[in-house]
Amino acid sequence: MMGCFALQTVDTELTADSVEWCPLQGCRHLLACGTYQLRRPEDRPAGPQNKGGMEVKEPQVRLGRLFLYSFNDNNSIHPLVEVQRKDTSAILDMKWCHIPVAGHALLGLADASGSIQLLRLVESEKSHVLEPLSSLALEEQCLALSLDWSTGKTGRAGDQPLKIISSDSTGQLHLLMVNETRPRLQKVASWQAHQFEAWIAAFNYWHPEIVYSGGDDGLLRGWDTRVPGKFLFTSKRHTMGVCSIQSSPHREHILATGSYDEHILLWDTRNMKQPLADTPVQGGVWRIKWHPFHHHLLLAACMHSGFKILNCQKAMEERQEATVLTSHTLPDSLVYGADWSWLLFRSLQRAPSWSFPSNLGTKTADLKGASELPTPCHECREDNDGEGHARPQSGMKPLTEGMRKNGTWLQATAATTRDCGVNPEEADSAFSLLATCSFYDHALHLWEWEGN
């Protein structure tokens, strides 16, 4: 049997766009969720007036909140319990470092103030909390759009420096170093990578001196950080803005990319002229995540098309289109965040199937313009990128397009999880725990996925 079962829906109050499970042993029950809320002047109470009686115009404000949840498998009704909330500038991206640093788990945030923040996980009375550790402003008047750690592959060399690559709304990439003794952020290099927003930056986990970037100019680029500013390749294979990239932590030469063009491409990094496979997913691909244990499974947050789980086995080995194993759309919402849990998930018992209401148990927010996240408009700009590439303006189809009505699901009522060092052979191939977050209904969803 194969299917996705809803365990819980949490109202995040502000619109949610980023969700990340902690990968570190002993902390894998912890889930971070970031939010992004655009507050326009008209949303505020009546403001002050100047002496002439005219209203003082205030700029738009991007608000954010960081939530930390603990997964408790002894509570079958509400397994996710909030343990901390922290108001911040709006959050565009988050990533946990894959290794402990100075004895602590570290969470990196990319925020709307143009900064990369480091937060340290510390034990509290009953659980854990995140406390500020370091912050670095990338540039003036920009939004920090993404970040990635250099530690994605198991078995990091002891002499390998700890690095972060980040991207911003001006099209720049920023290479940062993290001092592991007294964790602090230090900028190593910055360079112009794209003409417009650099939506995503990511390491090659097997060769962390190599990074990749995707921009709103529709370009996918590779860079050698030892020679900042000189690209290794430029691919125009995506036809709209490139907004998601992840190197496989399991297979050395495999890279996945996603775009507003609603396609996921798999690449062999030894030949970036042509992808191994091209899979349409009917929605802009904001985030993609390889499964922590099963090398062929890829999770994708596909905006108005919900989330999808792909089997990439044949795509990698036979250059065939990846198989979409699971596809779930959520009415009146945009799925921007998705992540696999590192917990081993076993011994599930389920109640009879039932149908969710259309809002999946949360209050549905009024629909707002797609510009709440820094998403471009729907039309194409025929600007030229200087390389003979007519620049398509990234956009999304109407939110209602392709959305399904209420679906029938099974509710999981009990589970057993294990947080420990994992031998891939021990991981139960049938069950996985995952989380997604959606924008307009400000909701965090917890799912159990059962595969073959």
From Swiss-Prot:
Residues 378-390 have a biased composition (Basic and acidic residues). This is Diphthine methyltransferase. GO terms for molecular function: diphthine methylesterase activity. Interacts with INCA1. Pfam families: WD40. It catalyses: diphthine methyl ester-[translation elongation factor 2] + H2O = diphthine-[translation elongation factor 2] + methanol + H(+). It comes from Homo sapiens (Human). Residues 371-402 are annotated as: Disordered. One of its GO terms (biological process) is protein histidyl modification to diphthamide. SUPFAM superfamilies: WD40 repeat-like. Catalyzes the demethylation of diphthine methyl ester to form diphthine, an intermediate diphthamide biosynthesis, a post-translational modification of histidine which occurs in translation elongation factor 2 (EEF2) which can be ADP-ribosylated by diphtheria toxin and by Pseudomonas exotoxin A (Eta). Belongs to the DPH7 family. One of its GO terms (cellular component) is cytoplasm. The gene is DPH7. The lineage of its organism: Eukaryota, Metazoa, Chordata, Craniata, Vertebrata. It is an enzyme of class 3 (hydrolase). Pathway: Protein modification; peptidyl-diphthamide biosynthesis. The modification Phosphoserine is found at residue 353. Its EC number is 3.1.1.97. InterPro entries: Diphthine_MTase, WD40/YVTN_repeat-like_dom_sf, WD40_repeat_CS, WD40_repeat_dom_sf, WD40_rpt. Keywords: Hydrolase, Phosphoprotein, Repeat, WD repeat. WD repeats lie at residues 79-130, 131-185, 186-229, 230-273, 274-313, 314-403, 404-448.
